[in-house]
């Protein structure tokens, strides 16, 4: 619990709460809503009727545990049973049975689902809310054109447009538009009813000409005219029932279904009182919308801001799962209808169980979790990543925007995001501003809006009430800005305070304030809230930092940060990584695999996670933190997980850093590090890789797993057991065989030995040979085998292949090429590992651990790292930890600097080291060159910031190519490490080489090493035997390709070779 401004206390909501609430809403409401929509199904003769009895549906507890589902690659789901009845109308008999409809994947305690053994998460989508929106645009003459856009629940649009002559049109597509009178007549109104129900009948009459009167003479004429314009049909179509059905399906169903939220928005915007259960667009809505549009034309009314959050709705996990359930029931209905007709045709007696199959629902959900863009594999790099992933809000996805077409205005920060969507945390690149992160206190309301909490300020009552307000409500209140949190009640009443009102910032007296913020972190996401001194950083660097914290690798020895923000504990607890006691008791046994807890007359065995692989190959491992015989309370930490210490998030290490140049080794964001970080395993992490192989039944027989592999060296097979699978605990190197496998294949007739041909001719014996298809360890995969899983197929089906998975653990120390970063967007690549005796050292003899470039601070404006650096030094010397809320300047001016200097001064006094705080240059110190022992000319900032090691590691990226595959068309090497590709020499690289005058290297890169087919073959031979490299005389393949392309355009192109001896031009065809 964290204190607000005065005596009130506010709790931070659970970070997974949005996912839990969404799933519970689906189970409690969504399921029954969709089941009630399931219709009664009759056969063609209307003799039998099938129906579901929704009241008695039940979800069964899963048969397997979460851990087993992950281990065996199964889905953690619940079976759904519903009562169904089959009624014979002639005899009025009814047969009722409880039928199994299918499996619904359940949500676990992390807010994720396990589908086929993979953790998947459904992220929230931000969509335009259904309803009507008015806006104006300038036409080519510079005149404002006013439009009203009706957006349906399906995302379809119907635009009403008023032109210069005050005529109102309904635009059914980008090119086609019809008169609004035709649309209203097609919906069933006559001219008298239209004119009686509008505010401006004279405007409607003004564009009613003879031609229009003919079109709206009858409903049939209007429907025909509307159909002609909508479907772009020529000629004279004839009115029919099928034409009406097509129009209903293609237009009215897609563009006029408002839904529950759309009806509410329509009623509010147009001041209507149509019942909430009327979710279809009525003629009355269009008449009211047209009246409003005419008012807009003549300067009455307010245009809508399409980017305001009150005009958006959140499509949560509940809505997406409900949509999929409805889709599955539609498919089930069609299947039941077909099965029923088939049974009657073949004179069989159907039963409810025979009519319903469970595959429809199960496959619908499996395809949704596997293929839908909003269902993503849970990023499990570290505990912070797991939490943040479920709190994303995306404008992308079905019915949303695309990264290439979204405008800058949509991506930009909007005042209505305050306290709802974080203004900092978003993805970098093409999706910037389109994928955001929810603020800490934000929640999704009943109507799909994002709500933020505020304290209500009341003069009558001294008690402060907390309200959750939607974006459409809070802009009508005076909301005091965050710095009012610091003022006590006595001084508040005397001062004027900054406040927000209708997206503007004002300065008003305290008595006029209606609401105030509840918490300093209220505006930020979790990632941004973990950055200390964030108010001293440029927003772009804070964005990079909140993204890079999610890329931090869990280290083998984690360490708490000296300077933090106070949210580290909650992030760790909500991530589910540490093990927490569910009730009090006494520890009676503990080891690395389990903790046994005794309490309340029962004994509970708590299994621990041991060397488990995350999907980013990081190591998830739990270490017990309690000893045998200790009494514990409910909620106490039993075991720490990856990147947590004492139940707090611990992503990096506090290391001694100096900001100074060092022989150019730290220029341009390079980082110089001490060898101590390698030898003492400061930045050592474990990574677990998974390698798998399948065995299939081929047309020539089944594949075999064996250790008897012909034509392979015994050294490569040394780690295999008698079954042909690598032994647990083996150390394996690149190229070693992990699983021995032989695939049978038929030999060609010519390759048979004479005796084999004789046997085949006499006895008809098919002689087969086997091909070696073993699982080999690829480059960079060396390590220790920690687990082998042989997943056997069930039922002996050839379609379910056996799978063998081998897990190999690697220990990775920090090395040159690894990426490290601070928490302020200060990132760099390790450029050199220096012996500790050569590193710069402090006045007490300690060598520094890292040397950063001081030029990386001023231009990037992330000064927060300097505050953290100096405060970390003081905390390290005083053995203190600091937890600092952002925007501490609200208490007094220069609050951050005063805190840092006072702590440095105290550290200087307590340790009797005057160099820690020198008044001439506070925060800086004279340090010495480790190579010469001389002091550097200028004092240097030294400190202990929190530095992370990121997942971008050189072991995963370093790559070299000798020879490999070539592209078929250009004959140039492929691209990328995975394809054993080459390095592209582009236009600018060629310029650089030209600038240095390296003609021979340039020629080799563009010919021998690239796409000159004959020359590259000759080079290989001369390299093997020695001798001069032959010079190519013909053109490389890319030039020949250009010539072929020009010939396809009927342009003949030849090139000429100039001989060096006589300079005569010899013509040569390409």
Curated annotation (Swiss-Prot):
It comes from the Eukaryota. One of its GO terms (cellular component) is mitochondrion. One of its GO terms (biological process) is DNA-templated transcription. It holds the Pfam family RNA_pol_Rpb2_6. PROSITE patterns: RNA_POL_BETA (PS01166). The keyword Transferase applies. Its main location: plastid. GO terms for molecular function: DNA binding; DNA-directed RNA polymerase activity; ribonucleoside binding. Keywords: Chloroplast, DNA-directed RNA polymerase, Nucleotidyltransferase, Plastid, Transcription, Transferase. Belongs to the RNA polymerase beta chain family. This is DNA-directed RNA polymerase subunit beta.
